[in-house]
Amino acid sequence: GDCGCSGASSCTCASGQCTCSGCGK
């Protein structure tokens, strides 16, 4: 479950949209 975020603590993908919390992009 990676949404293009490096070191993301939480990634949620729904309806083609990805939300990452704690993302260390």
UniProtKB/Swiss-Prot annotation:
Annotated binding of Cu(+) 6, by residue: 13, 18
Binding annotation for Cu(+) 2: 5, 23
Keywords of the record: Copper, Metal-binding, Metal-thiolate cluster
Alphabetized GO MF terms: metal ion binding
Keyword presence, Metal-binding: yes
Residues that bind Cu(+) 1: 3, 23
Amino acids binding Cu(+) 3: 5, 20
UniProt keyword Metal-binding, yes or no: yes
Positions of Cu(+) 5 binding: 11, 18
Domain of life: Eukaryota
Function: The metallothioneins are involved in the cellular sequestration of toxic metal ions. Binds six copper (cuprous) ions.
Listed name of the protein: Metallothionein
Organism placement in taxonomy: Eukaryota, Fungi, Dikarya, Basidiomycota, Agaricomycotina
